[in-house]
């Protein structure tokens, strides 16, 4: 399509004016489109024009950096497809989708969209049922309408043509610039410093809110690589191994002689005690079994690294003894880091002659469990397909079915059994009326109708979870095989958008997580755990314990020999029982936003041990006489094999 002429002028003059006008339009579009896209992206996340404009005017240099990144993406897409309008439309669609995903993640679990979320292809579909509210659908519809209008401009706007060589060179420059932003090349570091960029790695919601989505997302690319701790070296690990050998010695001497109980870990989906909510009452006790065990048995509270989701990260901490605190915020080890055998509780018990079995009542591919469990040394993995005609409650297999599978697994083995079971029934969201209107436990208190419905649905599931625990206890009370059950939730449930139930009840004072006190942060990450056994064990109360220290604690209670790394965990937990990225709790119960100086050296050793095992040279195995990483997880070279019908 030719540029239109201008009447009353000679043809050559009209053509020249038209070209000048067209060139001006191109320049304006190349500058204006990225600015508008950044404003739109931030508007999606911030919710109002006022909040977006306030951020823009207070942080105009950050706004310009976000626009520069979007400009590079826009030009790169143009270099690929060669159409200005199509590039604008595709850029708008792509970046709007990223903004929407980040918006929903923040609303539901308090985390923005990270670079590594791109690789959660199947898992990402799990968010679809969560975005069907009217407000969400309006946002999605509006975005697609705007993109459609942009594409319509193709009918009137002439095609901007550049020679293929020019497009290749320009595209390569864009890729180089984006890569430089991702790895923070020196020239980018200088640019960011001059703009006053403050990367808030310990609080990613604040990081995105302050720096803008495009810039924060790009800065997180470099965090996909876990850096080597400054003090990590073979001499350092050899010295640490020597002290660990001294710890392991007494532990071995105190180990229970010859008794090998069945050890059953049950991580119940989103299990939490709803009676902890203030200003809310229930028609009956929703979790009587857990409340009874809190009085009769060892119990306490686990400090979870997650809220509302990210179940596999809790598994990672419990099964390996490693901490999410030393990995990039928002990362998923099951997807990103575990691609080879790694020592775990499964391989530990397998080495003692146990059958190590994993059970999960959902898809085996979810969070890459099928592969990860093999690397951890599980002998078998029963996923959703391994359940024979199971009962469903709502959309998911009932927790009772998991309890029955646990019993069947133990009964079918001649050797003692280690089981790690993960339930699914009470997965959120809870505004779906999955059980109909007949909720056995009624809720009263300072909640609106929507929040009350959400809480009643959740409580129904928590009640079923509690009942499924009692089913196991009833069975193993009659068993002659010594058995211990460790029952806990992976994280608190996401009870509505913006922590709705928690805010309305007064459990927290605001939906803005970056404004929570340390006490509120602790409450929002503390889940109850209980232990039960059919043999005598002294009762203990545990005020706080990180998930990464749970395995070492259980082995201590069983008086079983601990691997060197878990021996260190046991000692560290006496000084720092609670360790999250932005919350540290010491042995006196004092809360800190970061590791106190008195424990910094000990925590750094923990970081070095984790790096050595996951990414380093496995010096610890060399100097403690422990099996190598591969042998620890797969001592016979077989790995995990699915049960019949399982994954």
Task: Please provide the spans of the model-predicted regions.
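Transmembrane and membrane-interface helices of multi-pass
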Residues: 2-207
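Short hydrophobic "helix-edge" motifs at membrane interfaces and signal-peptide entry regions
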Residues: 72-73, 258-260, 479-481
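Short alpha-helical interface patches
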Residues: 109, 117-126, 138, 215-225, ...
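Membrane-interface micro-motifs in multi-pass membrane enzymes
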Residues: 109, 115-118, 208-213, 308-309, ...
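Alpha-helix initiation and N-capping motif
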Residues: 118-121, 185, 210-214, 237, ...
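Membrane-interface segments at or immediately adjacent to transmembrane helices
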Residues: 182-265
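Solvent-exposed soluble domains appended to multi-pass membrane proteins
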Residues: 249-255, 268, 273-647
């Amino acid at each position: 399509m030719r540029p239109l002429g201008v009447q009353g002028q000679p043809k050559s003059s009209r053509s020249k004016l038209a070209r000048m006008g067209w060139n001006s339009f191109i320049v304006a579009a190349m500058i204006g489109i990225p600015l508008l896209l950044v404003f739109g992206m931030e508007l999606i996340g911030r919710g109002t024009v006022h909040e977006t404009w306030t951020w823009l005017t207070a942080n105009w240099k950050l706004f310009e950096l976000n626009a520069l990144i979007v400009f590079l993406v826009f030009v790169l897409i143009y270099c690929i497809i060669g159409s200005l309008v199509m590039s604008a439309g595709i850029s708008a669609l792509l970046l709007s989708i990223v903004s929407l995903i980040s918006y929903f993640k923040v609303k539901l679990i308090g985390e923005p969209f990270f670079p590594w979320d791109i690789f959660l292809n199947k898992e990402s579909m799990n968010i679809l049922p969560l975005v069907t509210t009217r407000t969400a659908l309006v946002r999605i519809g509006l975005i697609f309408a705007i993109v459609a209008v942009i594409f319509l401009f193709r009918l009137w706007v002439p095609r901007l043509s550049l020679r293929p060589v020019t497009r290749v060179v320009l595209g390569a420059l864009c890729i180089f610039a984006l890569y430089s932003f991702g790895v923070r090349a020196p020239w980018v570091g200088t640019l960011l410093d001059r703009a006053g960029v403050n990367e808030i790695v310990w609080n990613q919601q604040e990081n995105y809110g302050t720096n803008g989505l495009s810039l924060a997302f790009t800065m997180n690319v470099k965090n996909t690589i876990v850096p080597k701790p400054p003090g990590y070296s073979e001499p350092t690990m050899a010295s640490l191994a020597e002290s660990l050998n001294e710890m392991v010695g007494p532990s071995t001497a105190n180990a229970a002689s010859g008794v090998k109980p069945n050890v059953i870990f049950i991580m119940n989906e989103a299990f939490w005690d709803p009676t902890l909510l203030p200003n809310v009452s229930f028609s009956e006790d929703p979790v009587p079994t857990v409340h009874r065990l809190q009085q009769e048995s060892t119990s306490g509270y686990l400090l979870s690294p997650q809220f509302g989701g990210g179940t596999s990260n809790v598994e990672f901490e419990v099964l390996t003894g490693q901490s999410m605190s030393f990995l990039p915020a928002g990362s998923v080890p099951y997807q990103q880091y575990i691609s080879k055998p790694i020592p775990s509780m499964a391989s530990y018990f397998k080495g003692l002659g146990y059958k190590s079995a994993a059970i999960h009542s959902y898809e085996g591919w979810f969070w890459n469990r099928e592969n990860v469990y093999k690397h951890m040394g599980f002998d078998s993995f029963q996923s959703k397909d391994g359940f024979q005609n199971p009962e469903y409650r709502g959309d998911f297999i009932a927790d009772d079915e998991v309890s029955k599978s646990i019993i069947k697994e133990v009964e079918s083995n001649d050797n003692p059994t280690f089981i790690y079971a993960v339930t699914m029934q009470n997965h959120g969201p809870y505004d779906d009326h999955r059980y109909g209107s007949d909720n056995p436990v009624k809720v009263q208190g300072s909640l609106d109708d929507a929040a009350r419905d959400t809480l009643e649905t959740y409580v129904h599931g928590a009640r079923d979870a509690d009942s499924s625990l009692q089913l196991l206890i009833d069975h193993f009370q009659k068993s002659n095989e010594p058995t211990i059950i460790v029952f806990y939730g992976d994280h608190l449930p996401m009870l509505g958008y913006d922590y709705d139930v928690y805010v309305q009840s007064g459990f927290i004072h605001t939906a803005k997580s970056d404004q929570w006190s340390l006490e509120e942060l602790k409450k929002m990450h503390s889940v109850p755990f209980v232990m039960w056994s059919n043999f005598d064990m002294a009762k203990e109360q545990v005020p706080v314990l990180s998930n990464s220290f749970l395995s070492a604690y259980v082995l201590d209670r069983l008086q079983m020999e601990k691997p060197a790394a878990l021996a260190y965990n046991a000692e560290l937990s006496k000084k720092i029982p609670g360790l999250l990225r932005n919350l540290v709790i010491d042995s006196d119960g004092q809360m800190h936003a970061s590791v106190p100086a008195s424990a910094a050296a000990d925590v750094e050793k923990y970081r070095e041990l984790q790096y050595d095992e996951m990414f380093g040279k496995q010096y610890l195995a060399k100097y403690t006489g422990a099996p190598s990483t591969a042998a620890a997880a797969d001592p016979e070279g077989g790995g995990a094999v699915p049960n019949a019908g399982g994954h």
